[in-house]
Swiss-Prot record:
Coiled coil: none annotated. One of its GO terms (biological process) is threonine biosynthetic process. It comes from the Bacteria. It comes from Burkholderia pseudomallei (strain 1710b). Keywords: Amino-acid biosynthesis, ATP-binding, Kinase, Nucleotide-binding, Threonine biosynthesis, Transferase. It catalyses: L-homoserine + ATP = O-phospho-L-homoserine + ADP + H(+). InterPro entries: Aminoglycoside_PTrfase, Homoserine_kinase_II, Kinase-like_dom_sf, Pseudomonas-type_ThrB. Pathway: Amino-acid biosynthesis; L-threonine biosynthesis; L-threonine from L-aspartate: step 4/5. GO terms for molecular function: ATP binding; homoserine kinase activity. Its EC number is 2.7.1.39. This is Homoserine kinase. The gene is thrB.
Amino acid sequence: MAVFTAVSNADLALWMRHYDLGDVVAFRGIPSGIENSNFFLTTTRGEYVLTIFENLTAGQLPFYVDLMSHLAKHGVPVPAPVARDDGTLFGELHGKPAAIVTKLEGAAQLAPGVEHCVEVGQMLARMHLAGRDYPRHQPNLRSLPWWRDTVPAIAPFVTGEQRALLEGELAHQAAFFASDDYAALPEGPCHCDLFRDNALFAHAEPDTGHSVRLGGFFDFYFAGCDKWLFDVAVTVNDWCVDLPTGALDAARADALLRAYQTVRPFTAGERRHWGDMLRAGAYRFWVSRLYDFHLPRAAQMLKPHDPGHFERILRERIAHAGALPETHACN
């Protein structure tokens, strides 16, 4: 989340006339992230987040806001879009689509432990199952077609060794995506960006036996229909990584994956291709971070991420694929 489009007090006052949310108490931009303009909004009715969509069109947006509504109605803790006075879930601000959603409880855990990974794994599986009957379809817009379009644009900015890795991994993933095994993998709506800063944790209730409690997942604006295993791989590559080296932390990865499969057991095909999908998850973010770093957009509060982090992760996943835990295997 970042701020590309500024919103004045006068802009906000006009915008809020379309909502029954009381009077504005506080309003400030959110500096983290790189895709949309985001603001914390506090009113006399509660706390919310206002998002102005910098790339998604009004035609694309219903997939995302309706998905959050669908998941919230199925008991998954996600931000719920707030309806406007005409019943719609988004409008237009400065000529761009914009929406208000509820603000989740809790704070991000940027140094997660095993207990946090257990909570994330279980809820990710619940989210996947809750999305099975979601009627809209939107492909993951940062998948293979986007990689093919983007790699030539970033190639002039990287070393020869990096270019060889970019092109070699693209060929590997293209062959994987074209396989019958890939086609058979379970799929549905995915978050596609479930990093540790896109989940919140609140204090656990007394006498529950839990040391932490997941407040919820947010920032669904990279979501799309994809293989569930890709969503798991993206999540593991962030929540279970040793930051200096990019290697997987075995204890955290095992905890997250075992927790996930207590809700949705992995298939035999998913087990065969776990290594390929870990590489796909790392590749997707290496490519996007290279693009954002070398071809940045103007923003008031933009903080680009280090592309080298996911280059290290990709090299580690190629060298050490790992395996899914064997408990609760199914065919």
